[in-house]
Amino acid sequence: MISRDEFDALVARGHTRIPLVREVFSDLDTPLSVYLKLADGPYTFLFESVEGGATWGRYSIIGLPAKRVYRLRGHELEVEDSGEVTERRHLDDPLAEIEKLRLQYDVPRLPQLPAFSGGLVGYFGFETIGYIEPRLAQWDRADELGTPDVLLMLAEEVAVFDNLKGRLYLIVHADPAQPQAYAEAQRRLDALVYRLRQGGASYPQLTQSIALDESDFKSSFTKEEFEAMVERAKEYIRAGDIFQVVPSQRLSVGFNARPVDVYRALRALNPSPYMYFVDLGDSQIVGSSPEILARLKDGKVVVRPLAGTRKRGATEEEDRALEAELLADPKERAEHVMLIDLGRNDIGRISETGTVEVSESFAIERYSHVMHIVSQVQGTALPNLSYMDVLKATFPAGTLSGAPKIRALEIIQELEPYKRNIYAGAIGWIGWWGDADTAIAIRTAVIQNGRLHVQAGAGIVYDSDPAAEWEETMNKGRALFRAVAQAAKGL
């Protein structure tokens, strides 16, 4: 904890937000229990991670209710402060404006702070591509969900859970422009510690148990319509327009249980590198994404293409046989090589010459219902590179669009009946100092207005089997189908 004199010295240096940190011994809590005690409500989030399919990441991040929220719909920005819309304006370059918003907050980088201690948190929906590629700006499909194209919360109060040490870091950012800023931040930290010490989180039992299964999810396509879409995609491939494209289907079901219960079930069923629960008040996002979109950290840019899928085996022996089959499949290997090349091209546009490398190639990662081939491409970022530059170079992921990317996106616009909204976009954080970590929004549910929506795609190449591609999308959705069924039944 910084002293009052240290705080005043930081104010004198011109910082616009100053973090105060309280370290709490919290070995009897979990990240989820801390979320329920401190954050359960609108404009909050919980981020967790499982590395290598088996080991929980060291840090979990809990976002307490954000007072300021930025929403973008097309080129119209809306700013909400403490529940009131305070600003609406047109933006010529929305992504440049987001970088300006981040730069408004000058925060000292103190040695005791974790990698993320505050900043912008939220999502960039799939239609963000319209800000990057003007010819894709008119996504003239029905907008079934109506979610903002971009939504970012200003995370000024966060709790960072150290899973290794059983310690919790409560972080409150004081605004020096406010009277008694230091004392108010201390009082806020005292109140948070008090809430932590009040025993278990309040969590009433579900009043109505509902039986759901996979057949209750209704697709935007019939099976026959999806297979016909695959055939149309293959016609473009045969004509030489593209090498690959990734069409998807959306599956929806009525849902009135607690959204956080879907997260509870999902983190047990399908632990993944990116686990997230984001409560936006009128909607919730629940996901267990296996795939990074892009990470910018300490001057390094990383993407990690994930493509090539098999269902999990019933035994370890069957898993190993399926892994060998997957790695030997010429179609899967060709598709994966194509996406490594796309990643190298994307990273090469924003990296120092000669620094781009494939640091991991054709590894297998196992998840609850499927296994994937994964590789990693990284480079040394160009000087003064911002995450918005990274987003422009890498968005959307080639694994959710195709190659060549722009033509594949045009074909997706033609083939799919709805805007993708959050699906296949990016979810994560941009820190005060410019580092960022975002996942691709796959294996993700969006809950709003009494309905829950899941979306999944399949990579189509010249010899794809339409029936097999339908089944691949269903396999990718099954962890969520099971989690939703458990939540509806009651945990």
Regions found by a protein language model. Name each.
Residues 1-491:
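Extended alpha-helical targeting/anchoring segments
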